[in-house]
Regions:
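Solvent-exposed beta-strand/loop surfaces of large extracellular or lumenal domains
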Residues: 33, 39-63, 304-310
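An acidic-aromatic substrate-binding cleft motif
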Residues: 90-121, 233-243, 336-453, 458-466, ...
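Beta-strand/loop-rich accessory regions of lumenal/periplasmic or secreted enzymes
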Residues: 101-359, 406-409, 424-427, 458, ...
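Solvent-exposed loop and edge beta-strand segments that line ligand/cofactor-binding
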Residues: 317-322, 416-429, 479-494, 527-544, ...
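Long, well-ordered core segments of solenoidal/helical folds
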Residues: 387-406, 451-467, 510-531, 563-585, ...
Length: 732
């Protein structure tokens, strides 16, 4: 039995509210997704399942579950998952029919058609007795900085997901222009049984060699019924501010950098900042368009009038949004169709829930029992360590802006001059999404899941190369660099897939899975290049990080293609240690040196491989590497140095060493490995506890709050949590 806990959230009942959760299971526990039920007050809820990961024996590792539950006003509630099928009393209206050139969908509140090779999002849509024809739906449309206009062509619709409560339609299309190359675009429509809204996502890809400067980008619904139109736009910062007109006059709102600079907001912005919508209501029906996380993805604007609603993903007249070659970016908006008598308070309520949906939380014991994550689940908790981890995760900077949201600049890299005077973006170095997912599982704090979802969404869009004629770039993740990709490199040591796979399990969105596979394929191509053929000619983290990603992909897919290079890397580490007496790496022309944190990356990755394929020689290699590090890199003050040169052996502060020490203890049972990390652990906890700070300011194309990037938590969480657990096991 698994308990899904919902915290108290809104002050109104949400009946049959659509929700979703990712359920982990231990090997052999569940073999058939139809064998589970979700119970609320002993009544089975409507559910829809998708297996996102299995074990090698075919049993289910992760199960993505959509469900509809009655969530009460002003109080928490629990739902129970049981491993037995129960009959559901609710009969929900949801169906789709494939037509000659598209699909027809009906859910009891809405009926709509989509068609292939169309210039309109819907062919028809009917809601509350009102009929919209295709000419009502304009866009998405785009104008670049050269005033060249693009119009969306919806080329081919497919069903990405379908079940009793939810249908997800996906369309491959392109933004067309007669005078220049088209821009690939993906559109998704998510609809739920009995609900009168459509969650719409538009993902634009710059599959050209040139930089795309977006001057305007939007979508609109035109209103043909001009009489008795009520128009409204609204934004919220704590309370919602409405601009309305009872006779359909134009009302509009815009979000700019200056507005954000002048506005105070204390929310964790990945969870919620405010809502932002436009509504047009006639005598027959109304439609409200809400832009998801509009403040975070500024610039944005909305407009409503007797002519309909307009959603500006990039408003005309603002500074153009820059998309470098190979970038993608998804933006979402909800189209909520409602009766004409719907009160404005309920329209605002549904818009706000879209921004901050109810999310269930599982006990850490569920993840621990399933064994799907590293053993980081401490039972005798240390107050200072727990607070330091939360503080470090919460205090990361937030970078507002359509292309920046979900990433942060690294101010240390920037200060070093790596960007030639421009910001260096972290590009989710060290896998911040994965650290957040682990923290969510360990702590049960909902916002860490939101951190994971926001940053992984940025990672698969902006930080990954979606277009290039160079196969060594295509599908790979960019190293931290200026403008996210400008002048950047793609190398083995700066590509991560575990957080992306976490998001696949958490959302059921196969695009995360596809991106992870693409990164893995890129790593395989890189490993075939001359750079990686000679052991000791590069740092241990290069193939160390590669091994971590390849092992994760094997665990996820059981595809043997990931093992050939994994075995090759393991053997290369053996030859490397035999040749140099350790994993020494070149630094200057005439030196090879020890770098403790890079050696620790290799240790951590080898241990992941070892857990899949236990071998005595790997155990010996890991222990020898950690012994060598303690003998040569541990200073008299109890800390490890940064790098093995007189010019670089300053006090090291990299927590990755703690993971290597904890692994050595796990393999040997010898407490000396943990004792060698006492000072590093204390220093790391002190640094984490005092992380954060900084003012809000505008830099380049972002409004930045705080100064601590995501790297500190990404780099530190798993090593600290692993060492912390080892201390508990050792009784230290």
């Amino acid at each position: 039995m698994i308990t899904l806990h919902f915290d108290k959230l809104f002050n109104n009942d949400r009946l049959l509210e659509p929700c979703f959760v990712s359920l982990p299971f231990a090997k052999g526990t569940l073999t058939d997704a139809s064998s589970i039920s979700l119970l609320q007050d002993n009544q089975a809820l409507p559910i829809q399942t998708k297996i996102t990961s299995t074990y090698e024996d075919g049993s289910i590792r992760y199960l993505f579950v959509r469900f509809m539950a009655d969530l009460p006003a002003n109080r928490a509630t629990d739902i129970t998952c049981v491993l037995q099928p129960e009959s559901v009393k609710h009969t929900l209206p949801l169906s789709y029919t494939e037509t000659v050139d598209g699909f027809t969908v009906s859910n009891g509140e809405l009926t709509f058609e989509v068609e292939n090779h169309s210039l309109h999002l819907f062919r028809t849509l009917d809601a509350f007795g009102k009929h919209y024809d295709k000419e009502c739906f304009i866009g998405p449309y785009l104008t670049n900085s050269r005033q060249i206009s693009f119009q969306m062509s919806f080329d081919h619709w497919t069903i990405a997901e379908a079940g009793d409560i939810c249908i997800v339609l996906s369309c491959k299309g392109q933004l067309l222009c007669e005078n220049t190359s088209s821009l690939p675009c993906e559109v998704r429509l998510t609809v739920y049984a009995g609900k009168s809204w459509v969650d719409t996502s538009v993902r634009l890809i710059n599959a050209t060699k040139d930089t795309l400067e977006i001057s305007s980008y939007g979508f609109s619904i035109q209103e043909k019924e001009k009489d008795s139109v009520h128009s409204c736009v609204a934004s919220s910062n704590y309370k919602t501010d409405f601009l309305t007109s009872d006779n359909g006059e134009t009302v509009e709102k815009e979000i700019t950098a200056q507005m954000l600079m002048n506005q105070g907001n204390e929310h964790f912005a990945e969870v919620f900042y405010g809502t932002f919508f436009a509504d047009c209501t006639t005598r027959q029906c109304g439609v409200c368009g809400t832009i998801y996380q509009a403040f975070q993805n500024y610039p944005k604007a909305v407009r409503a009038s007797s002519s309909g609603i307009e959603l500006f993903l990039v408003p005309e007249g603002d500074t153009p949004v820059i998309m470098q070659s190979g970038m993608a970016r998804e933006q979402r908006f909800q189209l909520y169709f409602h009766p004409s008598e719907e009160p404005l308070s309920e329209i605002s309520n549904r818009s706000t829930i879209y921004q901050m949906p109810d999310r269930p939380v599982l006990s850490s014991k569920v993840y621990e029992a399933a064994g799907v994550m590293p053993d980081i689940f401490v039972h005798e908790k240390d107050f200072n360590t727990e607070c330091a981890l939360i503080q470090c995760g919460d205090s990361h900077a937030r970078s507002y802006g359509m292309m920046n949201w979900g990433d942060t600049p690294d101010m240390n890299y920037t200060a070093q001059g790596r960007g030639n005077g421009h910001l260096i973006w972290t590009n989710n170095e060290y896998d911040f999404p994965h650290a957040c997912m682990l923290m969510f599982a360990k702590s049960g704090i909902r916002r860490f899941l939101d951190y994971c979802l926001v940053t992984a969404n940025h990672q698969i869009d902006v930080d990954v190369c979606h277009y290039s004629e160079d196969l060594l770039l295509l599908g790979g993740q960019w190293e931290h660099t200026q403008g996210h990709t400008v002048g950047g490199k793609i190398v083995c040591s700066h590509q991560w897939v575990e957080g992306i796979l976490d998001c696949y399990h958490s959302t059921g969105d196969e695009r995360y899975y596809e991106t992870a596979i693409g990164i893995g394929d890129n790593i395989l191509r890189l490993l075939d290049t001359p750079t990686y053929q000679k052991e000791g000619s590069f740092s241990a983290r290069e193939t160390g990080w590669a091994l971590r990603s390849l092992t994760a992909l094997y665990t996820e897919t059981h595809d043997a293609k990931w093992l050939a290079k994994s075995d090759w890397i393991v053997n290369q580490f053996k030859d490397w240690a035999n040749t140099y007496g350790g994993w020494l790496a070149p630094y200057m022309d005439n030196t090879v040196i020890r770098v403790p944190f890079m050696i620790s990356v290799a240790v951590g990755s080898l241990m992941r491989y070892y857990r899949e394929f236990p071998r005595k020689d790997i155990r010996t290699m890991i222990l020898n590497a950690v012994d060598d590090m303690i003998e040569n890199c541990l200073m008299d003050n109890g800390l490890f140095y940064y790098k093995e040169l007189p010019s670089l052996n300053r006090l090291g502060n990299n927590p990755l060493i703690l993971e290597a020490l904890a692994i050595a203890y796990e393999l040997s049972g010898n407490k000396k490995y943990l004792q060698a990390g006492f000072k590093t652990y204390a220093k790391t906890i002190e640094n984490m506890a005092h992380s954060g700070g900084g003012t809000k300011h505008t830099l380049e194309d972002t409004v930045l709050t705080g100064s601590t990037g995501t790297k500190q938590f990404a780099q530190g969480f798993l090593p600290v949590a692993t060492y912390y657990k080892a201390l508990e096991k050792a009784g230290l």
